[in-house]
Amino acid sequence: MSKSNRVAGNRLYFGDNLDWLQRIESDSVDLVYLDPPFNSNATYNILFRSPVAEDASSQIAAFDDTWTWENGAERALDHVRKLSLDTFVLLDALRRTFLKEGDVMAYLAMMAPRLLEMRRVMKPTATLYLHCDPSNSHYLKMLLDCVFEGQGYINEISWKRTTAKSDYAQGATHYPRVRDVLLVYRKDTTTAATFNQQFAAYDEAYIAKKYGLKDPDGRAYQLDNITGPGGAAKGNPSYEVMGVTRYWRYSREKMNDLISKGLIVQPRPGAVPRFKRYLDTMPGVTVSDDWGDISAINSQAKER
């Protein structure tokens, strides 16, 4: 690829993402997030104008998220054959069996070359997040498994919507559809990648139950167990602390350091000492793969 055809960083590129992906150098991208059309058979308003005057009228028109085999899917599948024979074989099998040349098959054929190019441009440490909905997430997950050669899967995140879609009313024959899906893949799971663990604040009921003790200055804490589970079999040392001999989870040196800092306390004479764990030293609740408490971004939010 000539330098004149390569894309530069920190720019917003307009047009078909496949065209631009093909201009990005291999192993150069740290993070990929895509929120592609979901094959929802819905119509959406375009939020941008074409920089080319003669294209403006067509670009302003509503985007129709309905896929048909006649709309370039055959060419896309031929492109996949050149990029990855395994991925082509998978899609061809779906086409020949139950998906035929329907809308879902067309959707997958159009997604496949883009996902293959995304994997190519990702660094070994890069991660990909694909945002979709449950209507086709199972097909996309199978496609991603093939694109990443069966080794890149990390998580499937369920993201609860703030409101249910308007597909549920009295007399409905299905459960309300209230979630989206984030499929998370890493290019090389054997290579250390950047991952910043996320935490959410504790709710008030949890704080009241677990951190009901307070210092004179109002600093909340709880008294936590410091005995070593498994005893000697787990390598925990045994010695005396405040007149009590147990197997402890800390070395004697570490225990003495905590005592000097006032973090090891004895609730009453003869009781097993405990660790004074302050609420303000805790990061919060670990964010899992079930996102149900993320507020919507309104027009005044700083993320705008």
Model-derived segments and spans:
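Class I S-adenosyl-L-methionine
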Residues: 2-24, 28-30, 38-142, 146-304
